[in-house]
Amino acid sequence: MSGGRLPIGHGRAGGFTLVEVMIAMALGLLLTAGIVSVFVSTGKAGSVQMRMARLQEEARYAVGRIGEDLGMVGAQYCSNGGGLATARTWAYQDRLRSPLSYVPVADLSLPDNSVTLATTPTAPFALPSSFFMRGYQCSTTDCRPDVPLAIAPAMGSGAGSRVRGADVLTVRYLSGRGWAVRADAASPLAPFDIVSSTGDPPLGTFAVGDLALLADCAQAQIFPVTRAGTRFTPETRFPGSVPAGVDTLTDVRLFDFNRDFVTVTYYLKLVADADPDAPPGHRVAALMRKVNGDAAQEIARGVERLDFLYGIENDEGGTLYLTADQVDAGVDAAGVAIACPPQPPASATTKGCLWRAVKTIELHLLVNSSDELPTLAAGELAYRYSCDASVTCTSNADAAPPAAPLTTPLDNGLGKRLLRREFTGVISVRNYNP
């Protein structure tokens, strides 16, 4: 039976030594740590990229939406020439003139209006330049000129407040297609009829008490009317002055001044963050667009700075970029007075006359990612904003960028650990500003 005996030592159990096990565990931990690190880095990069993509999309839409309205500033029907109107024998040879109002300023009921006239007109007057465009340059403490509460809320750090240090801008232009008019060329203007055609708005939208704006490609007049069916009878609020006749050789159209003369105001507002995962009391900045005095609508979220520079054409043909308070005061950056451009006949005031000379508007937006990301590195927090060094913007056309990024946000109630990027645009004013 000795042939079936196993050799000595073949029955002992085999395995790893304690040192080998410890080495394997250490290698496993290192491998696990590496995998976790890759996942964490990938997650962080994805989070940053997602926020950056959202930031860029918000900025793209904001610049486009503002640009559409700024490009329409001062638009009138069929009379957007590039020079001062001079009455000619034939109306179609005339150039642009500002609409002539046959009602007092208070009766125009212009929404978001902060323009006051030194004297109350007692006769028909041309709408001042600042009725079509007026900006407000704001620091963290005040705005110049002051922004009435009827236009935008007061600056503050709570939800519902206007963002500190952000400009405000109100523009107006004529929109809509109006109605064709059958009228006599005789002056004064006699009762006239509306000729509706396909695509015209319903005549019922012209409400009782609305003012009429009548344009004939050479001039525009604003006056009260009474309506009976399709017949309109012009009136006046200035005794002894009645609307003038129109040129029947041109395409005369009637507009509802209260509805078609559009007022648009832009400002920034702090809104409460509705995200259930957001910290309590977290606020975000939003770009607001207010039309015809109605409730403001949120256009884009994350816009924390809004600044405008206005390129005016001086009497020598040069272009100067000024802030809103400089345009309103009629001075350059050094405080030197700038001559007013020629004013339309019967102009009510020369105050704010440089708004008539605005040819381009330079837009600056600082847009953030809305929600803070604690893991952001210093390089990711760095950004450059043309208006960060002071409350006064420097035009990109006039100065080189700073040597180093500016990384100190304004004290405007928003978080510090946010992605921030500047977006700019230069919008040409296509219509000669009245």
Predicted regions and their residues:
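General secondary-structure edge motif
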Residues: G15, I35, A45-G46, V246, ...
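N-terminal leader/signal peptides at the extreme start of proteins
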Residues: M1-F16
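Structural signal for terminal/edge beta-strands and the immediately following C-terminal loop/tail
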Residues: R420-P434
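N-terminal pilin/flagellin-like segments and related low-complexity appendage regions
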Residues: G67-H364, S370-L419, P434
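Aliphatic-rich helix starts adjacent to a transmembrane/signal segment
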Residues: F16-V19, I23-G67, G71-V73, N433-P434
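Short coil/loop residues immediately preceding or within conserved phosphate-binding loops
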Residues: A13, A220, T424
